[in-house]
């Protein structure tokens, strides 16, 4: 269950249970019936947010962050397998906001052009890699791209990362 935790002083309880629940959520997408383009209206995409309490997704532990990231990637890989069986032109990607993972999502794009707008022309944060930094296993052939989107009024750096299917020209 997705939940915003405003009580920052409370210790996060039940971490192993929450991680098992997150893994079950990711595995569920292997058999999930995909929404049709008509279901999303004129948006051109369908997304699923990370279903955890914010204090788990934004926890300072490297291990917990890596687990959340890997669950997003596993979800996207399961969705991509489902989307390949459909005849439509669909693309799947993880859209990650760093360092606030709670805002991250897995997105199923129904429009190649809309996916291209997220995909970008280059990897602006290269040679950095979330996959290397966190020991993540990416599906074969998938790409990783990072962009610095920090605004002057923000307190710290904000990065957007896309980990998803390659976009052939």
Please report, for each region that a protein language model flagged, where it lies by residue:
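Charged, amphipathic alpha-helical stretches
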Residues: 25-35
């Amino acid at each position: 269950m997705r939940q915003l935790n405003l009580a920052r002083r409370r210790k996060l309880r039940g971490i192993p249970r929450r991680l098992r629940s997150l893994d079950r959520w990711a595995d569920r997408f292997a058999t999930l019936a995909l929404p049709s383009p008509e279901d999303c209206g004129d948006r051109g995409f369908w997304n699923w947010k990370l279903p955890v309490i914010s204090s788990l997704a934004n926890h300072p532990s490297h291990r917990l962050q890596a687990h959340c990231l890997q669950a997003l990637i596993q979800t996207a890989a399961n969705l991509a397998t489902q989307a390949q069986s459909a005849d439509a032109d669909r693309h799947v990607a993880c859209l990650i906001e760093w360092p606030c993972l709670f805002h991250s999502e897995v997105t199923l794009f129904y429009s190649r052009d809309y996916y291209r707008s997220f995909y970008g022309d280059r990897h602006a944060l290269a040679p950095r890699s979330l996959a290397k930094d966190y020991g993540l296993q990416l599906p074969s052939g998938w790409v990783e791209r990072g962009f610095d989107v920090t605004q002057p009024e923000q307190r710290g750096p904000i990065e957007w990362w896309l980990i998803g299917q390659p976009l052939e020209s």
